[in-house]
């Protein structure tokens, strides 16, 4: 069962369980001696197409060039390489990616004035029973346990393979 960021637009395609955690949105940028926690005119900033706050950010930062991407994870590498100046991600995703893959290269800072992302499980629209079962299970988990599990996920040990090289391009396996 995939976890997903809730949005009204996505609700037309899938069912969402109740949100099990919320997390702030952040900007992710290259770490530099003169790193500032602001966006500047002309910057190229990636935002996943499914983030609802896209139009709100365009109003808040009209001088920025917004580039929609399929997901935030692939955009981290583009920020590191300088192809993008920044990206919008959730704090949980950003903290994990920076700690494990870009510890001395990227940093993040909170985006002021925007609502938090609500993370929940997503289901095919034809599976309302499964959604109800998951909702009951989630409601039985104390909030302190959800926090503990989230912290455990963030502090996973470093992996030694370069997943960017593995997953940076689509590939297909054809069998006959």
Q: Where do the model's predicted regions map?
A:
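Proline/Glycine/Serine-rich low-complexity intrinsically disordered segments
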Residues: 1-176
């Amino acid at each position: 069962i995939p976890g997903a960021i809730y949005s009204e637009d996505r609700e037309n395609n899938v069912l969402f369980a109740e949100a099990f955690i919320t997390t702030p949105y952040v900007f992710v940028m290259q770490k530099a001696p003169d790193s500032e926690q602001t966006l500047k005119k002309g910057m190229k900033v990636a935002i996943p197409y499914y983030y609802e706050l896209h139009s709100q950010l365009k109003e808040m930062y009209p001088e920025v060039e917004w580039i929609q991407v399929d997901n935030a994870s692939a955009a981290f590498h583009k920020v590191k390489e300088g192809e993008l100046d920044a990206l919008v991600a959730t704090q949980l995703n950003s903290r994990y990616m920076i700690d494990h893959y870009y510890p001395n290269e990227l940093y993040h800072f909170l985006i002021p004035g925007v609502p938090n992302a609500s993370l929940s499980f997503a289901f095919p629209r034809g599976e309302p029973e499964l959604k109800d079962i998951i909702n009951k299970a989630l409601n039985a988990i104390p909030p302190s346990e959800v926090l503990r599990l989230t912290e455990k996920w963030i502090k996973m040990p470093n992996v030694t393979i370069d997943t960017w090289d593995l997953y940076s391009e689509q590939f297909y396996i054809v069998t006959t």
